[in-house]
Amino acid sequence: VYGKSVGLVPYIMPGFLLAKKALEVYRANPECEGLILIKHGIFSFGETARESYERMIKLVSLAENRLGKERGRSGVAPESRALAYPAEIAPILRGLCAPSRVDGDCQRMIATYRTTEEIKAYVDGEELSRYSQAGPVTPDHVIRTKPKPLIVPAPEDGRLEPWTSEVEKRLALFQKEYRAYFDIHNRRLETPKIALDPMPRVVLVGGLGLFGLGGSFGAASIAADLAETTVSVVTASERLGKFESIGESDVFDMEYWSLEQAKLGKSKGLPFDGRVVAITGGAGAIGSATAAAFRGEGAEIVLLDINQ
């Protein structure tokens, strides 16, 4: 696709060693217009900001054109069963995926739903259990999405009780596997880490789409945004071959790297974190003031009023 116009930098965790390797690759080919940092992304450069920008557009366009040649519809049979609405299962997923806290309470989660034809094809793909569990499309996604999403079956309309039981089983296995992943990689460190909660941040739902989960609507939206990006990247990769992520030990190092965790901006929780408050008469002065008060205490707000 690129020939000698770019240099290829092998995967190295972000930091001085990666910068040093990038310089080494550049010096070996000083005429290149950019560098592809494997599993990270692409950089372009030039004598001016405009030249650098135009080279980026060119390099990205070449990649898009290459992917376009392989573009085609994913062969997924339409779902013949009547399915439950996303709004019916969202509260179930919110409740089941709420991590326990040391005080015996739980960290309530907000869920946001996404679906497109591409997402539906992805979650209904025959090899979903392979490509969706391969790892993040770029390393730092892991702090928002966890190493892997939770996969749950399509929820049949009127049969949410057995569906919920199946989700509970899959969630228990997800947590068990996350704890094993942590234990395996933590024991090799000189300074052990403290385990994060083992709950998923992305849930793939057969027949419907995906949910992003987080302690706030913002965090849930970021998880969902990254999951959508993952769907697009993996779908494109699978048209050319098979998607591959970084190794599991590299995923762990990134997830538990203090500099990455600092991006989350953790702060002391507020009383209504993870709760949704519906306020009637929300368009009036009292309603809006009430909304502001609850929002100040961490709640996500739904304003309701009569349109007249």
Region spans (language model):
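Conserved acidic E/D residue at the C-terminus of a beta-strand in Rossmann-like folds
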Residues: 305-306
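Canonical Rossmann dinucleotide-binding motif of NAD(H)/NADP(H)-dependent dehydrogenases/reductases
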Residues: 270-301
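Glycine-rich flexible loops
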Residues: 1-277, 289
